[in-house]
Amino acid sequence: MNERDLENYNFIRAGGIGFIEQKRGLIEVSGKEAVQFLNGLITNDVAKLEESERMYAAFPNAQGRLLAVIRVMRRNDKFLFETEAATHEKVYQNLFRFTFAGDFFVEDLTEKYGYFSIANYKLQITNSDSIEFDSRFGRDRFVPKEAAEEFLNELKNQAAVEISGELYEVLRIEQGIPLYAVDMDETTIVPELGIENLISYNKGCYIGQEIIARIYFRGHIAKQLTGLIFENEAAPVNPDDEIKSTEGKNAGRITSVTFSPKLEKTIALAFVRYDYLAEDTALKIGDLTAKVKNLPFIV
């Protein structure tokens, strides 16, 4: 991390506002049969969403494996789906193919909005046309492109600092936010993410529901995404490094790694086998020792 990033990091961790402009997908779903179709596709129950409420959900395939993690918002009797750039097209196609089956309409709004991830919950900018989602990071905003410049000026008026890609990666890992194609992909079974309130176990059937419900009601996940804190300040570890128990048994693999200035330790996101998930469990990565830490690293 360079000197400028470290200054901005300390500013944000002290309560200042930081922002980064990113590419994310935004898709609108409407129609009289929208709830019926959506509840057959995703893990959470959109029927429970009141106006302006939001929830996390996932698109699984028939084997319960992950296609995408999304955030859903109900707005004016329509549903807004927010997704990573890496899964945007996949989510859109999964929704669009059902538009021929009933009163169900899908519109891709991505090119109409700019997206800003805000590292702070106290930002006060009123814009009735913007769309806001909460995250572990702070508050994320979709802003109409014609209003983006004004929004940036408002951020600067509130002394917000711009977050570089490298700094965002540090903050992302500290907050335990998984990234598609890095920390999760189509080999991931949805419950392995360990994201709270991602799945409804009380609603009706949906694609992949049988596998996901069986894991919940009859057993437990084989592994789960969690955190690791290394004893060494600057531990030489990398994504895909194997994790072993202190007895030398395979215990998982690392997915993302960074150095946390606040914790003054190397930290990582990792899939860890069920038997070793308890917080503070000691694990080995080569000659290095790390302890399991429940996410996020920093509250």
Please report, for each region that a protein language model flagged, where it lies by residue.
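Acidic, proline/glycine-enriched N-terminal capping motif
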Residues: 1-68, 73
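Acidic, low-complexity central loop/insert segments
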Residues: 17-21, 25-26, 71-178
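Short glycine-/aliphatic-rich beta-strand segments at the starts of folded cytosolic domains
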Residues: 20-41, 107-120, 220-231
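Short, conserved charged micro-motifs
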Residues: 33-38, 88-92, 121, 146-153, ...
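Short, intrinsically disordered, mixed-charge
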Residues: 39-47, 93-101, 153, 157, ...
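Short amphipathic alpha-helix segments
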Residues: 59, 118-127, 236-249
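Glycine-rich, small/acidic residue-mixed loop/short-helix segments
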Residues: 65, 171, 193-199, 206-209, ...
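Anionic-ligand-binding alpha/beta catalytic cores of soluble enzymes and soluble regulatory domains
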Residues: 142-229
